[in-house]
């Protein structure tokens, strides 16, 4: 074991983050009643510049008046390269009550970006006497962001989650695609006349997972733009879950059930994990460090793998 300990991530479900524009308050009650673990009320890309101020008012009113149940309630502010973000933070922290759980910071390119928001939030919390600290989620959406992903992950104790914003990331990287997540038409190798598709987002997602797991942060898969393609959404979500991500964005209500389905361990997976733990307990009682389970070797590392699945299932059911 390394001298550097890997802290656990926040113990809360984050299977689905449902997004809705702050300029469409008619959607808020439906979002509050949804099955999403996290609701992201948006002030950024889905809101036109002339609508920013009203969207901010809409969100503050909704935070203070609607019943959000057990939802983890997050607001995506505008980017630090805009004239809107500071007013987003000030008004949210001064006017929205303690029901606000999280601020999502878009287009983060370095640790200083997180520090800037943290400093402002901390000052307002102290001035207003807020007793519940607001957490952060950041979105990696640029070449600079992925290049500095680990320093970003270590930037603030408020940081609880990190996502990849595929569209802006693709533009920053100069990628020849207009898709938002998913398989890209020309990203394949040709062998004996057959196309072998690959995943252009995999390397960036893997970097995010590694940085998040190192620093005790929840790694979350970003958007899948084609909300008419359920199987495409499931495929990308399964890949992300296998990679170590805990959930995925939903940009349409129909994607909520899909995300919850994929990121909830199946009964079969949980039963198998419990059987592996039981098999290893029996092996330990015999003085053995490994045993055979259904024809394959399991050992001490298998205990850790099985515990991941069991803990996730227990947290969701609770």
Swiss-Prot record:
Q: Does the keyword Metal-binding apply?
A: yes
Reaction(s) this enzyme catalyzes, per UniProt: (S)-malyl-CoA = glyoxylate + acetyl-CoA; (2R,3S)-beta-methylmalyl-CoA = propanoyl-CoA + glyoxylate
- State where substrate binds: 19, 24, 30, 76, 167-168, 251-252
In the record's cofactor note, how is the cofactor described as bound?
Answer: Divalent cations such as magnesium or manganese.
Tell me any Pfam family this protein matches. Answer: HpcH_HpaI
> Per UniProt, where does Mg(2+) bind?
141, 168
Some GO term, biological process aspect, for this entry: which one? oxaloacetate metabolic process
Q: What is its EC number?
A: 4.1.3.24
Protein family per UniProt? Belongs to the HpcH/HpaI aldolase family.
- Provide the protein name: L-malyl-CoA/beta-methylmalyl-CoA lyase
To which species is this protein native?
A: Cereibacter sphaeroides (strain ATCC 17025 / ATH 2.4.3)
């Amino acid at each position: 074991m390394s001298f550097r300990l890997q802290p656990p991530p926040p113990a809360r479900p984050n299977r689905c983050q449902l997004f809705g524009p702050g300029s469409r308050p008619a959607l808020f009650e439906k979002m509050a009643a949804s099955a999403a673990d996290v609701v992201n009320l948006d002030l950024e890309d889905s809101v036109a510049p002339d609508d920013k101020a009203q969207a901010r008012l809409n969100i503050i009113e909704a935070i203070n008046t609607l019943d959000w149940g057990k939802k983890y309630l997050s607001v995506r502010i505008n980017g630090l390269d805009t004239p809107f973000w500071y007013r987003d933070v000030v008004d949210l922290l001064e006017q929205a009550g303690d029901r606000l759980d999280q601020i999502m910071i878009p287009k983060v390119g370095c640790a200083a970006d997180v520090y800037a928001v943290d400093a402002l939030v901390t000052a307002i919390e102290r001035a207003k006497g807020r007793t519940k600290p607001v957490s952060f989620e950041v979105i990696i959406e640029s070449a600079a962001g992925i290049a500095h992903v680990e320093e970003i992950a270590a930037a603030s104790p408020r940081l609880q989650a990190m996502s990849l914003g595929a569209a802006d990331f693709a533009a920053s990287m100069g990628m020849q695609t207009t898709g938002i997540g998913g398989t890209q038409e020309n990203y394949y190798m040709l062998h004996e006349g057959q196309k072998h598709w690959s995943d252009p987002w995999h390397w960036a997602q893997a970097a995010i997972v590694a940085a998040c797991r190192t620093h005790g942060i929840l790694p979350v898969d970003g958007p899948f733009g084609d909300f008419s393609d359920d199987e495409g959404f499931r495929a990308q979500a399964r890949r992300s879950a296998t990679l170590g991500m805990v959930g995925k964005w939903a940009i349409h209500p129909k994607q909520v059930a899909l995300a919850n389905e994929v990121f909830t361990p199946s009964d079969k997976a949980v039963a198998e994990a419990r059987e592996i733990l039981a098999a290893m307990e029996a092996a330990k009682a015999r003085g053995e460090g490994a045993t055979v389970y259904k024809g394959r070797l399991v050992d001490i590392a298998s205990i850790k793998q099985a515990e991941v699945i069991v803990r996730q299932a227990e947290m969701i059911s609770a």
